[in-house]
Amino acid sequence: MTLEEKKEQVKNFRPIDDTFFEVLADDIGVCQEMLRIILEDEKLIVKDVIVQSSERNLYGRSVRLDALCILGNGKKCNVEVQRSNKDHHLKRVRFNASVITVRDSQTDDKFEETIDLIVVYISEFDIFKRSRVIYHVDSVIRETQEKVDDGLERVFVNTAVKDGTTISEYMDCFLQKEIDNAKFPKLTNRVHYLKHEEGGVNEMCEVMEQYSKKAYQQGEEAGKEIG
């Protein structure tokens, strides 16, 4: 397959598409820029990123890791993109957070040593239908409305609501096939690299091939079970 044929394969991908996002997010600079915007913390540091297809992914298929970021303050942040609205999203977030927490814990750990985890759930629709681009879901004491810190932060952000904020502008980029926005240089440059430069196009095609092989294998296994 020529470079031009490969470019043709990846040209229609957008950041909201999970396969493209996974490759896009396999870059510390992109994730740091994204989380600084979504979590509104200009000093936030991303030290490492693990994606689903990475050999360093020790979580297996039990949890979806579009991008698991290890932050400078020791917290972990699992970022997931979701286009389909045919799921129970809150339970999905709860399940994935639980798997990550258990996987990163030892049986003799004290509970105070349980990891602090942030979940950022990016969707193509407004989950709560309250016309907000971002929602922070907290645990609270019902009787007093006081927030309880149990080490889990849940942030839901979407591409559907346009409210003129920087977060909304950034989220709108997730719907574009091509991005050229000086406010978001890391995202802009990474998308260009993956779509127009040989190294990036090859990287994208390799991941696509991996998923194609997995889908074929799963289909064969399912066929054997039926047979």
Regions inferred by a protein language model and the residue ranges of each:
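Short, charged alpha-helical interaction segments and adjacent helix-coil junctions
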Residues: 1-11, 15, 19, 77-82, ...
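Accessory alpha/beta interaction modules
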Residues: 1-153, 163-165, 218
